[in-house]
């Protein structure tokens, strides 16, 4: 099972049980679109939802989480995982928080995984979105751990930019060519800097010698 329906959520919540849902995959796979959809469904179901995004990701908006297709959701822009915990604790004093959404989890510090677990242990549904692999094809931090810890995992695929086949890798492009191995790990530039690639079309970055 990769996602619960509202009736199943109500059954779990009757026991005040929290859990972790992870939405992952490569660039342009629709992760943020699915992330926003799930949080909106829960909001419509009268759950109190708070969403967070890392301050490094300001491609489209500072105040909203926005997908490549234009779907958007109000969010808190935070610099660290500790800010998430502080805001949730403050908001809980005003009204109970039922659901937390964390976008682009790979851009947060590594303490975010422990905080996500604490929130779930305290009865909060935590829905997380992030890339599973970096541009080198290696596991991305935080997502690699959440793949093990999450109760529900949805892995999405894109279409290969070159051949149209199923893609599960993110190719970083610099000056029309695949980036070198030693390029910075994090570069948030959207479609101008990345392409979804399949196994066959993905070019493993070369090490600069």
UniProtKB/Swiss-Prot annotation:
It catalyses: thymidine + ATP = dTMP + ADP + H(+). One of its GO terms (biological process) is DNA biosynthetic process. It is found in: Cytoplasm. ATP binds at residues 25-32, 103-106. Keywords: ATP-binding, Cytoplasm, DNA synthesis, Kinase, Metal-binding, Nucleotide-binding, Transferase, Zinc. It holds the Pfam family TK. Zn(2+) binds at residues 160, 163, 198, 201. The keyword Nucleotide-binding applies. Homotetramer. This is Thymidine kinase. It comes from Mycoplasma capricolum subsp. capricolum (strain California kid / ATCC 27343 / NCTC 10154).
